[in-house]
Amino acid sequence: MTVTGIIAEFNPFHNGHKYLLEQASGLKIIAMSGNFVQRGEPAIVDKWTRAQMALEAGADLVLELPFLVSVQAADFFAKGAVDILERLDIEQLTFGTEEVLDYESISKVYGQKAEQMEAYLAGLPDSLSYPQKTQAMWQEFAGLNFSGSTPNHILGLAYSKAVAVKNIKLCPIQRQGAGYHSLSANQEFASATALRQNLDQPDFLKKFTPVHHLLETAPKVTWSDLFPYLRYQIVTCPDLTSFYQVNQELAVRIREALKSSETIEELVEQVATKRYTKARIRRLLTYILVGARQEEVPSGIHILGFSEQGRQHLSQLKGKVELVSRIGKKPWDSLTQQADKVYQLGNPALKEQNFGRVPVILL
């Protein structure tokens, strides 16, 4: 049986994600963000609920991406996730994209010219943001030109880089329905953004989410719930540069902007510049919120849930890969566990996120 990897956030799980799972073949392994996601924000519902959503919709195995893999720019997010999936013996990586290109050929270009491409990237002026530099690199070496408004396509290119020296096939699937950030919906598909904007509309959730009962009943967390804790961190920490990736320039900008910011949106808007994108600023603020500092990615892989087929695959991996199914019995990643404690502050109805929790089992 083919073993297919999918990298996802499921924030929250919707019909487009179900479609992706239906198009994927064989045993489906999901590498999923934990309680904080790539764009630098808390997941709307916790990782256990989202893992159950995925399993009920056809996933076979759901593992958790560590915090410092989940909350990263596209290239680092993709590399970290692919490295973990490779250890679980995936043969192909399936992903949704706005533009179905020949990603295999694109990956070969990077495999052949990686050193030149990275040198070109490093030589671009710092006045450009990292996404702008990446776009310039792909345009120069592969003739690609794309818009920053197509994040799944950008991730597709990041996956092309990540698998360039690995024996993993790329399987792009045309994204269905509304765009990634779209607030509109068509007859069958709505974006995760639109769903997060309509959490108080049961009919909307029922129409566009296959496991709407889980989304409706799960405790929710948003940046507005956690913003007071971020404000406290910024006000009380004597040196913001002690946090992961925060430089002196940004530390000054963040402190100054906080004085006139009542919401996370206002703070991000004031701190962001042409060089420092809003997504990057949200990630930095997330690092400050959870107290993130540079750490090694854990060697163990935390399992959030599995089906019967997933259980059989895990049994074949025992002895080859360090699998963590119960934190407490075995330690895992201290930073991710710290981030989970902060996440729990966002809603008192949330259950303990790590200690004593066992994988969701759907047999």
Swiss-Prot record:
GO molecular function per UniProt: ATP binding; ligase activity, forming carbon-nitrogen bonds; tRNA binding
EC number(s) stated in the UniProt entry for this protein: 6.3.4.-
Binding site residues for ATP: 7-20, 96, 152, 175
SUPFAM superfamilies documented for this protein: Nucleotidylyl transferase
Positions of transmembrane segments: none
One matching Pfam family: HIGH_NTase1
Top EC class for this record: ligase
GO BP of this protein: tRNA modification
Catalytic activity: cytidine(34) in elongator tRNA(Met) + acetate + ATP = N(4)-acetylcytidine(34) in elongator tRNA(Met) + AMP + diphosphate
Subcellular locations according to the entry: Cytoplasm
Keywords, in A-Z order: ATP-binding, Cytoplasm, Ligase, Nucleotide-binding, RNA-binding, tRNA processing, tRNA-binding
Record-level GO cellular component terms: cytoplasm
HAMAP family linked: TmcAL (MF_01539)
Entry-linked NCBIfam families: PRK13670.1
Function: Catalyzes the formation of N(4)-acetylcytidine (ac(4)C) at the wobble position of elongator tRNA(Met), using acetate and ATP as substrates. First activates an acetate ion to form acetyladenylate (Ac-AMP) and then transfers the acetyl group to tRNA to form ac(4)C34.
Family: Belongs to the TmcAL family.
Protein name: tRNA(Met) cytidine acetate ligase
Source taxonomy: Bacteria, Bacillati, Bacillota, Bacilli, Lactobacillales
Gene: tmcAL
